[in-house]
Amino acid sequence: MKTIVKMIAAATVMGCAVSCGTPRGDEVPSDFKYLIDEFADLKIMRYRVPGWNALSLRQKEYVYHLSEAAKYGRDILWDQNCAVNLPVRHVLEDIIEKYDGDRECQEYADFLVYAKRVFFSNGIHHHYAEEKFFPDCSREYFAGLMAAVGDENAELLEAIYSPTLYRWRKTDVGDIVKGSSVNFYEGVDRKEVDDFYAAMADPNDREPVSYGLNSKLVKGDDGVIREEVYRIDGLYGAAISKIVGELELASEAAESELQKQYVKTLIDYYRSGDLRLWDKYNIEWVKDTLGTVDFINGFIEDYNDPLGRKATWEGLVNVRDEEASQRTVKLSENAQWFEDHSPVDPRFRKPVVKGISAKVIDAVTLAGDCYPATPIGINLPNADWIRREHGSKSVTIANITHAYDFAAQESPKSTLAEFAWDDDEIAMAKKYLSLTDEIHTDLHECLGHGSGQLLPGTSPNALGEFNSTLEETRADLFGLYYMADPKLVELGILPDGEAYKAMYANYIRNGLLVQFSRVELGKKNTEAHMQNRKLIAQWCYDKGLADNVIEKKVRDGKTYFVVNDYPALRELFGKLLAEIQRVKSEGDYATGKALVEKYAVNIDYNLHKEVLERYASLNLKPYGGFVNPRIEPVERNGKVVDYAISYTDGYLEQMLEYGHKYRTL
């Protein structure tokens, strides 16, 4: 599970104030720029790796090969997102590199923005809104560009410009399998998919594999439905063989025997596609709590599958931030206390919390579904039975959070000044929000996703297409409920009993207002994390109306949502958490569906229009992503003596380089 992006209010309010200071152990040049490009609704940033020079040569070698393995998975994600994505990308790369016509005209500028957007989204659909976006240059001009570089292709041009073809990457309307453009299914409808996997599942299996996680489901010409498994001699084999090659080199530089063992298990899994080996790898991986270097690499998250079953490929290589990790260690050491005092029905609590570990990390390489838009927190593994029996690992990605904050300082305006009600609310955010935002991420990932249990016989897929939204809702609510608990002050995690109010005010402000700047006017709220925030904020607003817990105010034609009663809001968070946990534990699909459809999806048109107009006046970009640092071996007399890190790559430069160097499909 991921906290996908830094929450928009926290990501942009820090243009007013930031409390995080200079990244640890990193001499940042005075002319260093975190923000390096802006276009459409996107901003591109750099992040730094402050602990790089403290790593040993062996650790750097381990990181280098893990990073190469991660980058070689890039083409897999592009193809998973939509079957035409790779052909489109190859044409865009050809035009940018080979076109010798006029590059100063407006239509070429429009083409270039489109290309950058496709690179950012790993395809032709918006990375958050799921809908296909289009070039602003004319179809005729685009066709001319293709012809100029020898890439004439009428079918591909139609795929780019048709308003109906490949309209949605993932849809929630009609037959959500046939109506989605993701490349997980071919020739099958939803019922056929459900029936296929229902026949596989054993409801009495207490340790089930994640059926369908690493495969494409295809109906052949003979009418037989089969899985095409992602493995070295199967689907995506060319990319997987490159990943395996780098993992083999990485294992030779691993920090410990345990790391060598689970890297070997991961390689065995990639060779066979056997999901039992994937589970074995996760069990071994979750035991590694002492290493400085860590990584994820594989088919992990199912957010992009309309049925919440099949996983996209992703990679992340990271190093531990020892000092900041002390905060998360306190949380994990007290996980049983938090579980025991949760406001949910005791039947749905874990009687014994096992193996929860947490740390703060610095990303070194982002890849696949973590690149260029990246999560700021991760909790894995996802299998409920592994979490129950073996525990989980949670991370908060500090240098990504800090990069967001420092990039925001480079902008003169902020959402906080525009959407907060008064100076007191602004002052509270400036004092506490940078800290409370990080702590909420810790609570969400470390404890929220790891909390609770399914009742015996409840399928982990029981909530179907609503599972991702409801799971993120559950984890957010767990964090929100405990933000106000005196236990956090007692543990020294929060400075005082007032700090949580900054998080509460920000969450409501974002969930009911600011986040809609990311949605095109008149469209529905479709992304799981945005849905979860709206569900929570809207439910609490509605349920607290009689007591004026959250008040809608209008001043000078502008709308604000103000928290009047913070303790009462905490009670509402607790009540909703109890209900969401019940829904998950019992697999109550009907209630989960009703909650999402009533509170999470629809946006009031007039309010939406107002938010977009106010946000536009700030000249800010609602979405952010990153370029990776460059890591290169340093040789002396034919021997590698170091691995140097640099932060010089531009956005297009890196995208084009990756398109050549790591092209496998």
Question: What does each model-identified segment do?
Answer:
Residues 15-19:
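C-terminal motif of bacterial Sec signal peptides marking the signal peptidase cleavage site
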Residues 25-91:
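N-terminal-proximal low-complexity accessory segments that begin disordered
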Residues 56, 256, 468-485:
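An active-site-proximal "capping" alpha-helix that borders the catalytic cofactor pocket
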Residues 77, 480-583:
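Long, well-structured alpha-helical subdomains associated
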Residues 113-219, 227-425, 433:
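Contiguous, non-catalytic segments that form substrate-binding/exosite surfaces or channel walls
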Residues 446-458, 482, 486:
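Catalytic Zn2+-binding segment of zinc metalloproteases
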Residues 452-473:
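Post-HEXXH active-site segment of zinc metalloproteases
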Residues 564-565, 569-665:
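Extended, compositionally biased alpha-helical segments that mediate assembly or anchoring
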